[in-house]
């Protein structure tokens, strides 16, 4: 049995003069929370929550800019101006109050920048080699610009020191320093190109200037991507050269290229379709070959893997960045012997979408108006929740934690709702953790959950509730489609046994996952599948987190026909027993007709609102939710309830068809204020 005193994760680590209180860290990432290019209140509160939660080191400022021609492509921090220093001082004081250390990543994007972002300058690189992902055609960096950028790195590091930070790291992987190291990008024939020693010269000169500006008693690390254009062996050779300079205090090792969407989703930020801790063996091999401390983060989402990495000496500090986006109080729970209560990172990569927000922790990055510590309610209420999908489960969890008397009515034999279908995909099974964690929480809280109970209006009226929350979800939106009786919905396709043979047209009218989960099921069953899309590319809504790349890869492997930009307008039965799907082409306005044995249709969900509408006339608020209060997690305006009345709300897909995060967010912000 692991105790707090013997847990490898809770042992301190000395980095130069800095004593880190445990082995858990959050690595630098672009959270998209800056305001006016600086880490202000929202940004700082996001990181402070992790410090309050017990981790030893939070690194921030992913891709922070040191120069004018490294633009604000990802809403990064601008370290090229002295105006950043007061923000860093407040930030440092805030984090240090909780006993955690604070470091910033500093970099120049090089060719990875966006030439069409202010100030609209040419991008630079060792050689004019275009990056596929960010699409800039860079100019070869001039000797004078090399000197300028080196100076900018030094000044940015000094600003970090002046701001009270404990250290910095520079970023090589895919960025300007790494571009000099990469022989496929660095085609120079001068002293900065050619041999391994020449290609690390720029990195050394940058860090010589940094040391000149910050001195020897400031922690300086190097985020180093293995096999980023170089072989693993040459990467080790480079690391030994860098280590031999005495300029560095640690290596933060990552793996692989990041110059395409797929490479980013596999290497740098491994998604749900990638195994747990995919590059830990590579990082361990790197550590065996160097003398400096080694940090590493890449889908180390669970404590068992993190503990193993430290116990076996594979790493010195373990990065659990996305795990902390899901559960910022992770270390505190470990210390208290309650790690089984930690909200799991399910690997959905939702945090890559627009901001550092978890698919099932809506408080993350919203700390200025949502708390992670759920307070007790001033007055206990009797709450009835109809539906045990993600929204209903979260509503029950929040209400019960606040001390309310909660009952949940669920029509099915198990909890989960539509999420059970979402988790049927071969690489999306971990989504079920969202359900399992909440079911376990409700068991701990002794919530009365009644399965196989289809709620009627009489159930609502007889319960005597003060608050009724409708979380009945949605059903496939086929009603307005002529010939819907000739189609299968995605619910049908994902729950029924696939036909033994025949042809199937799968129609994607939303750009979400569902159509492709169905297509995958039919391909695996050996059917002749074709895809029809309303959008110009598959799974268009999932692109922010890289899932579209997985589906496009799978489609290429399936070798199935794909027709884009066509909208399904009708399905009819043909005389030969097949189904005829009629489409309108959005670009040509032409009518397109396709035949198959089966047609599967994804057009989103329509709210199941019968019970809500029936209950409205008995409610004190007519089922109305004040949006201004709801949007900011404030209490709903008071509506005096008469005898037998209740306050009625609806959340999740029972309100409108959206996603898992929004369903849980609805529940969180409503119930936190009940």
Swiss-Prot record:
[4Fe-4S] cluster binds at residues 345, 351, 358. It catalyses: 3-phenylpropanoate + NAD(+) = (E)-cinnamate + NADH + H(+); N-methyl-L-proline + NAD(+) + H2O = L-proline + formaldehyde + NADH + H(+). Its cofactor is [4Fe-4S] cluster; FAD; FMN. The active site is at 175 (proton donor). Optimum pH is 8.0 with R-carvone and NADH as substrates. FAD binds at residues 391, 418, 428. The keyword Cytoplasm does not apply. Binds 1 [4Fe-4S] cluster per monomer via a modified motif. FMN binds at residues 62, 105, 223, 299. Its EC number is 1.14.13.-, 1.3.1.-. Keywords: 4Fe-4S, FAD, Flavoprotein, FMN, Iron, Iron-sulfur, Metal-binding, NAD, Oxidoreductase. The keyword Signal does not apply. In the N-terminal section; belongs to the NADH:flavin oxidoreductase/NADH oxidase family. A member of the 2-enoate reductase subfamily of old yellow enzymes (OYE) able to reduce alpha/beta alkenes near electron-withdrawing groups as well as perform oxidative demethylation chemistry. Prefers NADH over NADPH as cosubstrate. May play a role in osmotic stress response in situ. This is Multifunctional alkene reductase/demethylase OYE.
């Amino acid at each position: 049995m692991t105790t707090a005193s013997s847990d490898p994760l809770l042992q301190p680590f000395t980095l130069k003069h800095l004593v880190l209180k445990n082995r858990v860290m959050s690595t630098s990432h672009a959270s998209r929370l800056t305001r006016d290019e600086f880490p202000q209140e929202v940004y700082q509160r996001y990181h402070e929550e992790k410090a309050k939660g017990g981790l030893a080191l939070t690194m921030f400022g992913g891709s922070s800019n040191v120069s004018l021609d490294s633009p604000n492509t990802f809403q990064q921090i601008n370290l090229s101006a002295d105006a950043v220093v007061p923000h860093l001082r407040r930030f440092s004081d805030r984090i240090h109050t909780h006993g955690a250390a604070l470091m910033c990543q500093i970099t120049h994007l090089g060719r990875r920048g966006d030439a069409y972002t202010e100030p609209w300058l040419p991008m630079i690189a060792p050689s004019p080699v275009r990056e596929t992902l960010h699409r800039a055609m860079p100019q070869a960096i001039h000797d004078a610009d090399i000197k300028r950028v080196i100076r900018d790195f030094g000044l940015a590091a000094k600003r970090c020191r002046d701001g009270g930070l404990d250290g910095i790291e520079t970023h090589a992987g895919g960025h300007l320093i790494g571009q000099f190291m990469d022989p496929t990008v660095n085609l120079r024939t001068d002293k900065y190109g050619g041999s391994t020693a020449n290609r690390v010269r720029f990195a050394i000169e940058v860090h010589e200037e940094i040391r000149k500006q910050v001195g020897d008693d400031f922690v300086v690390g190097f985020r180093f991507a293995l096999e980023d254009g170089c072989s693993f062996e040459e990467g080790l050779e480079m690391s030994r050269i860098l280590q031999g300079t005495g300029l560095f205090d640690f290596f933060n090792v990552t793996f692989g290229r990041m110059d395409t969407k797929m490479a980013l989703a596999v290497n740098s930020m491994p998604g749900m379709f990638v195994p747990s801790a995919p590059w830990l063996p590579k990082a361990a091999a790197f550590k065996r070959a160097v003398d400096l401390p080694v940090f590493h983060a890449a889908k180390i989402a669970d404590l068992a893997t993190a503990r193993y990495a430290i116990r076996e000496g594979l790493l010195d500090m373990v990065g659990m960045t996305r795990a902390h986006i899901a559960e910022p109080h992770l270390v505190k729970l470990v210390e208290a012997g309650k790690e089984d209560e930690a909200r799991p990172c399910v690997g959905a990569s939702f945090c890559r979408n627009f901001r550092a927000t978890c698919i099932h922790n809506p408080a993350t990055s919203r700390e200025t108006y949502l708390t992670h510590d759920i307070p007790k309610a001033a007055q206990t209420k009797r709450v009835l929740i109809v539906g045990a999908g993600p929204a209903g489960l979260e509503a029950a969890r929040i209400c019960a934690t606040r001390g309310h008397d909660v009952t949940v009515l669920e029509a099915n034999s198990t909890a989960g709702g539509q999420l059970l279908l979402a988790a049927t995909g071969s690489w999306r099974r971990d989504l079920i953790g969202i359900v399992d964690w909440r079911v376990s929480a409700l068991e701990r809280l002794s919530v009365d959950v009644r399965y196989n109970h289809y709620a009627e209006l009489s159930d609502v009226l007889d319960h005597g509730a003060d608050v009724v929350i409708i979380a009945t979800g949605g059903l496939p939106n086929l009603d307005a489609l002529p010939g819907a009786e000739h189609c299968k919905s995605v619910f049908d396709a994902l729950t029924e046994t696939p036909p033994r043979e025949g042809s199937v047209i799968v129609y994607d009218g939303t750009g979400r996952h569902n159509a492709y989960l169905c297509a995958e099921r039919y391909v695996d069953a050996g059917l002749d599948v074709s895809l029809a899309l309303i959008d110009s590319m598959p799974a268009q809504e999932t692109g922010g987190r890289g899932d579209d790349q997985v589906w496009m890869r799978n489609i290429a492997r399936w070798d199935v026909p794909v027709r884009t930009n066509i909208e399904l307008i009708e399905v009819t039965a043909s005389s030969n027993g097949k189904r005829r799907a009629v489409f309108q082409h959005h670009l040509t306005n032409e009518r397109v007709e396709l035949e198959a044995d089966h047609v599967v249709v994804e057009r989103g969900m329509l709210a199941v609102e019968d019970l809500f509408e029936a209950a409205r006339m008995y409610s004190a608020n007519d089922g109305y939710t004040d949006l201004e209060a709801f949007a900011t997690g404030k209490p709903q305006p008071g509506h005096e309830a008469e005898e037998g009345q209740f306050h009625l709300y609806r959340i999740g897909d029972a309100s409108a068809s959206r996603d898992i995060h929004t369903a849980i967010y609805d529940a969180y912000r409503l119930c936190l204020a009940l």
